[in-house]
Amino acid sequence: MTITVAVDAMGGDVGLKVTVPASIQFLQDHPDTHLILVGDQPALEAELALHDGAVRERILIQHATQVVGMDEAPQLALKNKKDSSMRVAINLVKEGKAQAAVSAGNTGALMATARFVLKTIPGIDRPAIAKLLPNVKGTSCVLDLGANVDCTPEQLLQFGIMGSELMACLQGKANPSVGLLNIGSEDIKGNDNIKKTAELLRQSELHFYGNVEGDDICKGTTDVVVCDGFTGNVALKTAEGLAHMFAVFLREEFGRSWWTRLCALAALPVLALFKKRIDPRRYNGASLLGLRGIVVKSHGSADVTGFRYALAQACEEAGSDVIAHIADRVAKQLDNLKQSEAEAN
């Protein structure tokens, strides 16, 4: 199956200096994939000329005259940047010319544009930002990571459904466990919103584990962790900060003396494996779940390797037909709710 991915080639902190080489490397590893690079055509052609032309036949250029700034207000970008590389890339998904879009651009503008152009899946109130994160057992999906600061219990249930289907499609989990992020594992903990959400999750067909705490994300207690965007974003940024602090401490301790530097030299093979295991670039790429099309957000400061992983995730989501799986699961949940309400009346 040939998959075509639309790339916002101008988005991110560096733009085409990252997106173009990343696209070249990605195509070298994925012979059945095509890319549409969206952006300033002369600039893209000049950058492509600097790289290996063997995969050039699988690259199309779609000219776009505008670029969304990283600090631009989402609503202004939506109103005034209708020919931006971001908007055109998402339009290609809507038109069926691409099966997914990837952008390292402004997160708020990307969410607003994607929601406006693609619309949400029937039964989904709001899209959520979902990310696959490493844990001691493997990988888990955490959502929402910042799209929705305040969420109703019904919306959090929808997040649970979407996260469960994403893990089933991308990680092969037959019946992913779902945890609700809370201040404690006991049922009595949390505010009324959390308690209501827990009740809805218990009544659903999901494999609901129960409440989980922040450390359970790293422990891999559940395959999916559901939370509102405020809590999720704080948890994500805290984890990123801790990983950076740990790396700094490690460098400082290994560099204290000739003896510790010698120990570091001896430990290089193990350190290399450790670094690879927690390398944030391998987990670059957050899915905008709940839309009628696949959109993956790369970190704005991602390097070539990181952006390549975001492209790979978009390709994997397109190949697994995750949108259809989410739509089917949500439709079944809505039918069950209607049936329960009818029986209650």
Swiss-Prot record:
A GO molecular-function descriptor: phosphate:acyl-[acyl carrier protein] acyltransferase activity
Main location: cytoplasm
Keywords for the protein's UniProt record, in alphabetical order: Cytoplasm, Lipid biosynthesis, Lipid metabolism, Phospholipid biosynthesis, Phospholipid metabolism, Transferase
Signal peptide from the UniProt entry: none
Domain of life the protein comes from: Bacteria
Cross-referenced InterPro entries: FA_synthesis, Phospholipid_synth_PlsX-like
SUPFAM superfamilies: Isocitrate/Isopropylmalate dehydrogenase-like (SSF53659)
GO biological process: fatty acid biosynthetic process; phospholipid biosynthetic process
Transcription found in the keyword field: no
Reaction catalysis annotation: a fatty acyl-[ACP] + phosphate = an acyl phosphate + holo-[ACP]
A GO cellular component annotation in the UniProt record: cytoplasm
EC number: 2.3.1.274
HAMAP family xrefs: PlsX
Function (record text): Catalyzes the reversible formation of acyl-phosphate (acyl-PO(4)) from acyl-[acyl-carrier-protein] (acyl-ACP). This enzyme utilizes acyl-ACP as fatty acyl donor, but not acyl-CoA.
Designated name of the protein: Phosphate acyltransferase
Organism: Chromobacterium violaceum (strain ATCC 12472 / DSM 30191 / JCM 1249 / CCUG 213 / NBRC 12614 / NCIMB 9131 / NCTC 9757 / MK)
